[in-house]
Amino acid sequence: MGFGCNAAGVVATRIINSPREKLIAIITNNFSLCNGRWGTQILMATLFIGTLVNRHWSSLVSMLAVVSIVILGIGLSFFTSWLLSKTLLKGESSFFTLELPPYRPPKFWQTLYTSLIDRTLIILGRAITFAIPAGAVIWLISNIYFDGQSLALWFIQNLDNFGIFLGLNGVILLAYILAIPANEIVIPTILMLTSLVLGNNQGAGILFETEDSEIAKMLTNSGWTTLTAINLMLFSLLHNPCSTTIYTIYQETKSKKWTAIATILPLIYGFIICFLVTKIWNLIS
């Protein structure tokens, strides 16, 4: 279920009886690309990876690039599950027993209520609770100025060196900080901040959409390369969960320790892998 929504995936671990294996499932859930991250993957693959080959093959190459990220996420999920089961969460593996109960007529209204109220509206309410303040923060840092410079530009400049060290940039890092409430706003936030860096008035705290060709031109003009796009695809897979998922993890585990581990572990993976990819890319290019 994590491929649809990581928060829903965390809730779905309630069916696991073993507390140890439930924790492992919760921690590795973030390695599934949720709905909010597919847009970033597809856009980067289309604009930067697909353009490396003949246009007849560009769609196939773009698709394979996205599939590769998904496979990497699955591989890291298996690896992390194995690592946790040998270190922090040692213990005997439980057995899965499938019991077929007697047939009963479906309880339509009860199922509808449970699915709509308990599964959908509560998660949606949490998302709205975190997303509304995020919109206010994005607007404020873009429109509050000190010494003729907006707070957003100040943050970008201070994050830029670390971002370039990872094969990313300050815009991407700030966008992910601002987009903690929802992965869906990562690309609009990147475009807004990039427009701000380039000196366009369109980006003053307003999330906007534009054509793919204009996006490619804007990103290229601000120094983006194929390496930047690849690392963004990797970082989109390997970064902290959104705030709704973090809150849901805490609600399910009732533990600040495991919530912190589930939040920080993907970020550590992201930093390490982006750094290694950047070093290898620079060596062979």
Language-model regions, residue ranges each:
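Juxtamembrane inter-helical linkers in multi-pass membrane proteins
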Residues: M1-A8, K90-S115, G163, T194, ...
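Alpha-helical transmembrane segments
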Residues: S62-T80
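Hydrophobic alpha-helical transmembrane segments in multi-pass membrane proteins
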Residues: R37-W38, I42, I122-W139, I187-P188, ...
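Juxtamembrane/interface segments at transmembrane-helix termini
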Residues: T80-F95, F146-D147, Y250, W281-S285
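Core transmembrane alpha-helical segments of multi-pass membrane transporters/permeases
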Residues: F95, E99, F108-N143, I172
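Extended, low-charge hydrophobic alpha-helical regions
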Residues: G9-A25, G135-L267
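Final/C-terminal transmembrane alpha-helix of multipass membrane proteins
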Residues: I261-W281
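Transmembrane helix-loop junctions at the membrane interface of multipass transporters and ion channels
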Residues: N17, W38-L64, Y247-S255, L276-S285
